[in-house]
């Protein structure tokens, strides 16, 4: 496979889709989403060939490992898929990310959100993260199931709640890190206002102090013996300077826009203009963001846990942006979306150069 050529295709698709949505979203004229079906096709292509991330090669190595030992080291659900497809890696990605995209499309439809705005913000802000990480399947399943909790079906309401519960807890089997979101989920049903937001911030500070001073010192000596403890080591997050710049360019727009949304929607109480179910997703976004910040300021040497939790935000974040479109300043949305778009291109360009010199990170 010609990896640099695939990266060029990634760049072309990401830019074409982003610009297709960006100009109408922030122009004077709205556009019907005549490219709706084609957009999903291109999103699937990005998921199949997301060579801009080292995870694409990591999962392929897991498949090779499975062929030798009938065990991939991934969650059992992926071993079940690998057992059926007999080592065809692209087919594996087609099944996993195809189901994830289908769940995502169904979620958008259930919430009755404008498809053009929803896809536009998801493409600009979230697709590059969604396309490379296997947690995307679990995230799609969790947020899809959660939609039955906040917007149950009119008929057979109990069945809807039950189905949503099954989906939410099944998501954990797709990626163990989703336990974090499941634990946060009950708190999303508590309305978020200024005093409560400050209370949550204080709770994060207290938890941070307890973790850093009372918990982490006692478990630190055992980390090297535990599965998955590469998340806690500084070496696991060793990055060249160029990658640090790319990471900053990708994350900075999110931090800026989150601060603005907290001011507009929490401090100025504009979230009241959201429907009840959208308010729940907004609280979810805030809780995920605060959790990621807590991990960032913890004494854990690696930032892997921080950014893994942070990147779980993009599905509900796109939902919130599409609904906040008529509530907050479009100029701020445009500026931050442009920054996110440029950050995405920096990421793709860095990966392209990495493929050319054989040092993809």
Question: Predicted regions: what is each one?
Answer:
Residues 125-128, 161-187:
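Membrane-interface alpha helices of multi-pass inner-membrane proteins
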Residues 34, 105-124:
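Transmembrane-helix signature of polytopic, membrane-embedded enzymes
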Residues 1-42:
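Start-transfer (signal-anchor) and selected internal transmembrane alpha helices
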Residues 34, 52-79, 182-313, 351, ...:
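Alpha-helical transmembrane segments and terminal signal-anchor/GPI-anchor hydrophobic tails
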Residues 142-160:
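Membrane-interface transmembrane helices that cradle and orient dolichyl/undecaprenyl
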Residues 115-132, 136-145, 177:
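Membrane-embedded helix bundles of polyisoprenyl
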């Amino acid at each position: 496979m010609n990896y640099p050529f695939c990266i060029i295709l990634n760049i072309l698709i990401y830019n074409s889709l982003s610009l297709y949505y960006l100009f109408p979203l922030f122009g004077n004229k709205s556009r019907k989403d005549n490219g709706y079906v084609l957009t999903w096709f291109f999103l699937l292509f990005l998921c199949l060939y997301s060579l801009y991330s080292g995870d694409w090669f990591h999962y392929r190595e897991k498949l090779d490992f499975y062929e030798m030992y009938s065990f991939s080291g991934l969650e059992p659900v992926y071993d079940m898929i690998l057992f059926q497809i007999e080592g065809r890696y692209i087919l594996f990605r087609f099944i996993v990310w195809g189901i994830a995209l289908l769940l995502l499309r169904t979620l958008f439809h259930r919430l009755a959100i404008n498809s053009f705005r929803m896809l536009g913000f998801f493409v600009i802000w979230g697709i590059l993260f969604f396309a490379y990480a296997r947690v995307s399947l679990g995230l799609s399943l969790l947020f899809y199931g959660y939609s039955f909790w906040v917007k149950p079906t009119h008929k057979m309401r109990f069945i809807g709640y039950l189905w949503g519960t099954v989906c939410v807890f099944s998501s954990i089997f797709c990626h163990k890190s989703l336990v974090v979101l499941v634990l946060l989920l009950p708190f999303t049903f508590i309305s978020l206002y200024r005093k409560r937001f400050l209370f949550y911030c204080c709770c994060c500070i207290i938890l941070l102090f307890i973790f850093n001073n009372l918990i982490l010192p006692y478990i630190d000596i055992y980390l090297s013996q535990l599965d998955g403890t590469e998340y806690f080591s500084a070496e696991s997050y060793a990055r060249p300077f160029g990658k640090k710049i790319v990471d900053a360019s990708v994350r900075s727009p999110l931090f800026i826009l989150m601060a603005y949304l907290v001011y507009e929607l929490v401090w100025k109480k504009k979230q009241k203009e959201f429907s009840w179910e959208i308010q729940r997703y907004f609280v979810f976004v805030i809780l995920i963001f605060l959790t990621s910040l807590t991990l960032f300021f913890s004494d854990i040497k690696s930032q892997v846990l921080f950014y893994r939790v942070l990147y779980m935000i993009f599905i509900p974040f796109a939902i919130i942006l599409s609904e906040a479109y008529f509530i907050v300043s479009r100029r701020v949305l445009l500026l931050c979306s442009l920054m996110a778009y440029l950050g995405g291109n920096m990421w793709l360009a860095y990966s392209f150069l990495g493929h050319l010199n054989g040092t993809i990170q």
